[in-house]
């Protein structure tokens, strides 16, 4: 018989062990990630750390909850992100009661997913959630064709299509210096330049606690891009894509401030130089898509299904949810 119960930060050790069996990642790296999640400044007592399924006192499924604060410039709402949703192959039926436990939070908090696959997307859809427009694709720009061509050949002729990802994603290469795009290593200096949310849609609340935890405690760094026309803060995520992790990819996670349309080409060139990128991209649901000057340098790459889903049955966000890639874990 499957038993469902709520999780707390005290369950980190068994959770790390379970997720290790499901993902192939090491316990220490997962433990570190879970400990970081437990330090979430948006956490509140009403929202547990997650939910788990047990069979004969054996952990066989789990989902982690990540509260995130969103603001429309005047009001603040807590939304709950679902991540690390895994169920052991021997008890696939445990996924539904776990999701139902999570869904009960929707009475008070909007719920969302940021990296849904086809299976979880069907689950979200069946329980009344809707996909966020644009999340079914990403924008990509190929900077170096050879690693992309190698991936095409590998996918076409290689027998193994699903290698396990490494525990940590190394940066594509040693970063180079760039006079216009520079790292801001001091969190306090970065916090002074972040503007508050403007009235309008509910976007991720950019308060000091969130920026410090979500970016700097995670080992990331904001970059400043400044020219005669532009002055903005940027967040990038470096990763290795491809069957053999041969593609040095840079995702543009956030751009805060003013990026002048005339600087779009230079901005992309600075990213390519700084990170020696083979591929640059950003999510289709990102506010960056509003810049025609930026998107014309990119092509759309379609996903198998929408990646971002929202469940807000009581319209707490007034149908004005603005997705941010930084809101996804």
Tell what function each PLM region has.
Residues 1-4:
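Extreme N-terminal starter segment of soluble prokaryotic enzymes
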Residues 7, 11-64, 69-72, 127-253:
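Amide-forming acyltransferase catalytic core, primarily the GNAT-like/NAT-type
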Residues 19, 84-86, 256:
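Short, histidine-centered active-site or binding-site loop motifs used for metal coordination
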Residues 50, 62, 79, 109-112, ...:
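Beta-sheet entry/capping signal
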Residues 56, 106-109, 229-231, 275-278:
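Short glycine/proline-enriched coil/turn segments at helix->beta-strand junctions
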Residues 60-98:
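Long, hydrophobic/aromatic-enriched structural stretches that serve as scaffold segments
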Residues 67, 110-170, 216-217, 235-329:
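Active-site/acyl-donor-binding loops of N-acyltransferases
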Residues 87-105, 261-273:
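Conserved acetyl-CoA-binding loop-helix of GNAT-fold acetyltransferases
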């Amino acid at each position: 018989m499957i038993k469902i119960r709520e999780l707390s930060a005290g369950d980190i050790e068994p959770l790390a062990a379970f997720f290790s069996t499901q993902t192939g990642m090491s316990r220490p790296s997962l433990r570190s990630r879970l400990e970081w999640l437990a330090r979430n400044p948006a956490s509140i007592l009403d929202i547990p750390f997650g939910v788990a399924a047990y069979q004969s006192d054996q952990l066989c499924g789990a989902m982690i909850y990540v509260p995130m604060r969103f603001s429309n410039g005047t009001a603040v709402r807590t939304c709950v992100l679902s991540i690390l949703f895994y169920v052991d192959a021997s008890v696939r039926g445990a996924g539904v009661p776990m999701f139902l436990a999570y869904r009960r939070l929707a009475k008070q908090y909007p719920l969302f997913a940021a990296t849904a696959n086809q299976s979880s997307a069907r689950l979200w859809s069946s329980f009344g959630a809707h996909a966020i427009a644009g999340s079914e694709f990403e924008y990509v720009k190929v900077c170096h064709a050879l690693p992309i061509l190698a991936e095409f050949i590998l996918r076409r002729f290689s027998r193994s299509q699903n290698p396990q990802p490494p525990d940590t994603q190394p940066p594509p290469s040693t970063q180079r210096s760039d006079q216009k795009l520079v790292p801001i290593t001091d969190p306090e200096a970065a916090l002074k330049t972040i503007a508050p949310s403007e009235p309008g849609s509910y976007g991720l609340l950019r308060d000091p606690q969130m920026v410090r935890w979500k970016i700097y405690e995670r080992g990331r760094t904001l970059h400043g891009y400044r020219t005669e026309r532009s002055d903005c803060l940027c967040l990038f995520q470096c990763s290795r894509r491809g069957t053999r992790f041969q593609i040095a990819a840079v995702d543009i996670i956030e751009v805060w401030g003013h990026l002048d349309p005339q600087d779009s080409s230079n901005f992309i060139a600075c990213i390519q130089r700084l990170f020696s990128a083979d591929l640059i991209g950003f999510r289709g649901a990102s506010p960056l898509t509003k810049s025609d000057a930026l998107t014309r340098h990119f092509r759309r790459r379609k996903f198998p299904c929408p990646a971002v889903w929202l469940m807000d049955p009581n319209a707490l966000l007034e149908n004005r949810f603005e997705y941010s890639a930084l809101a996804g874990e």
